[in-house]
Swiss-Prot record:
Subcellular location: Cytoplasm
InterPro entries for the chain: KH_dom-like_a/b, RbfA, RbfA_dom_sf, Ribosome-bd_factorA_CS
Gene Ontology annotations of biological process type: maturation of SSU-rRNA
Subunit field text: Monomer. Binds 30S ribosomal subunits, but not 50S ribosomal subunits or 70S ribosomes.
Similarity annotation: Belongs to the RbfA family.
Organism listed in the record: Chelativorans sp. (strain BNC1)
Record's protein name: Ribosome-binding factor A
PANTHER family: RIBOSOME-BINDING FACTOR A, CHLOROPLASTIC-RELATED (PTHR33515:SF1)
HAMAP family named among the record's database cross-references: RbfA
Functional summary from the UniProt entry: One of several proteins that assist in the late maturation steps of the functional core of the 30S ribosomal subunit. Associates with free 30S ribosomal subunits (but not with 30S subunits that are part of 70S ribosomes or polysomes). Required for efficient processing of 16S rRNA. May interact with the 5'-terminal helix region of 16S rRNA.
Xref: Pfam families: RBFA
Amino acid sequence: MPSSAPSQRQLRVGEQARHALSDVLQREDMRDPALEGAVISVSEVRMSPDLKIATVFVSPLSGDKEAIIAALNRHARYIRGRVSPALRQMKYMPEFRFHLDTSYENFEKIDRILRSPEVARDLGDADDEDDNG
């Protein structure tokens, strides 16, 4: 049964790809209206076990997020070509698949819930029990 945790090689290549993609997305001019002036943060790159597919999680900091993701996927082959010099040690250049990173929104939602008066009251009751017990 295969392990679900990524290997050291997957993690290392994913991090190298993340850095290379960040540079390309920051410096390249991809003549697409959805990407004009868009600031895009590459938060994570997950490599498949065979290193042929890279799932790229991005956070557009401005603009229409869905349109930006669609544009990145349309330009994936161009981006792949621009990233290839930075990953020249690889036997096969991975296929990039761009997805919206929602981890920050999830973090904000959980933080809001934890700060709500109901949860604060319940957490306060638990602290009182710990002090008495």
